Regions:
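Membrane-interfacial, low-structure loops and terminal tails that flank and connect transmembrane helices
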Residues: 9-10
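A structural signal for multi-pass alpha-helical bundles of membrane permease subunits
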Residues: 4, 13-17, 21-286
Length: 286
């Protein structure tokens, strides 16, 4: 009887200790989550405020819901609306994603499944480029595209992805492919599959989580890219969303409509958020 009571007491203490620890962890996580998400909450609230209310009220809840910032912000002060800017953005973001996935998968397949001369040296060079700042190559690339007469087009933004210029994605896909057993390749070879068939019918279905992760990363990076379009795109008619938002901050008139800028900034966040939440399951797996 005494032994049973002792075990029960130990169990109660253990359970109490676990509950206190869990309460502390969840409280800490909740506080951190609120701190991280507060800027987004404030951004959403500020899109419905007037300029004066944005700078005079610390409350993120607007005094009244007003969609005027969204309407006027979408129209802009030019002859182009944000419809044009979003179309421009997707017109080079989507090709970048497709070419990046194709080229990165092919390069990763070569490194993960084939042996060839100087393989380790080539892989080392590939990994070394991960530590090379992209700004280092801006001037040489600008001169190249200028000599080719391709400035003020989206070609300088899209073309590098054809040649697997994202070593991070290549490295991630290589590691994912190495986790797939090679006996699947051998079985497919016995059944008459060639190398391309093994890639398309065996490896690609297994690579789905990794490919979706690459898609999310590339979409966010390309959609938010400011420096690339700023260097290569000069025509207002071809501006992406990132440049259009900067254009909206017009100091020449003396008045900056921050509520409109924040409204368009929130709309610019939505595509990436929607993509992430739709593919969250595969992103975690990848």
């Amino acid at each position: 009887m005494a032994r049973t009571n002792l075990i029960s007491e130990v169990e109660r203490r253990r359970r109490r200790k676990y509950m206190i620890s869990a309460a502390f962890r969840y409280t800490l996580l909740t506080v951190v989550a609120l701190v991280m998400i507060y800027p987004i909450i404030w951004l959403v609230g500020a899109t419905f405020k007037t300029n004066n209310e944005i700078f005079t009220s610390i409350n993120f809840i607007p005094s009244k819901i007003d969609f005027t910032p969204y309407v006027n912000g979408w129209k802009t002060r030019t002859k182009f609306t944000f419809t044009t800017f979003f179309i421009n953005t997707f017109s080079f973001v989507i090709p970048k994603i497709l070419f990046c996935l194709i080229s990165s998968t092919l390069v990763a397949y070569g490194f993960a499944r084939f042996n060839f001369p100087f393989k380790k040296i080539c892989f080392s060079i590939l990994m070394a480029t991960m530590f090379l700042p992209s700004v280092v190559t801006r001037i040489p690339l600008y001169i190249l595209w200028k000599n080719l007469g391709l400035l003020n087009t989206y070609v300088p933004l899209i073309a590098p992805t054809v040649f697997a210029n994202e070593p991070f994605f290549v490295f991630m896909l290589i590691q994912f492919m190495r986790s797939i057993p090679t006996y699947l390749d051998e079985a497919a070879t016995i059944d008459g599959c060639n190398s391309f068939g093994i890639l398309t019918m065996i490896l690609l279905p297994a690579l789905k989580p990794a490919l979706i992760s690459c898609t999310i990363f590339q979409f966010v990076w390309s959609f938010n890219d400011f420096l690339g379009p700023l260097i290569y795109v000069t025509s207002l008619a071809k501006y992406p969303v990132s440049l259009a938002l900067k254009m909206s901050i017009d100091q020449s008139s003396g008045i900056v409509e921050w509520n409109q800028i924040l409204a368009m900034s929130f709309l610019a966040l939505l595509p990436a958020l929607i993509l992430f939440f739709c593919c969250q399951k595969y992103f975690v797996e990848g």
